[in-house]
């Protein structure tokens, strides 16, 4: 195709709370879209410095943890194909306590800057951790505030959204992404987050045994009007 007539790159903005959220929850999906040429930008609100895992045996401490977790996240981004990484420099476990208007404004600025087709974040009630819920709530508010033309989705843990009725949703509210072809990248990114995964023996088993622990699909809850009710297996709308 002539360079002048190439279709513009699709863009995805992921706004999460901690290093490793991108890998542990939706690493297969991010690797899939990166391999298809999607330009991915990741925001990590914190550096995860209050995490309790210090390696196995422990090799880091509270003072060295922020730098090490940032380094490990950068490696995971390279592994998954995430092109851009931004930190909001919020202290871990305090996202819900920062000035929310300022946080929403920072996320809105990122949305304007990146102009993403897809925004990923946590569900404000199903995030499973106060930081997750807080960043999800702020991102949802920023998405609405900007009246952005893209689509908003909420990430979900494991296969919890295989039965969305348990959470007040229906199968039509869920997008199911086949990540089977990208599990090797997901496993490699797990291993990049060394200080967080060394205690999990299965991550470091022979590759085929470790890969067998992953599901073949990752699930996303639709969060914006233009995608609600559409049964799909892709986060990007056909234009």
Question: Language-model segments: which ranges?
Answer:
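Active-site rim/loop-helix segments in enzyme catalytic domains that contact anionic ligands
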Residues: 1-114, 141, 145
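Metal-dependent de-N-acetylase/amidase catalytic core
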Residues: 2-13, 84, 93-239
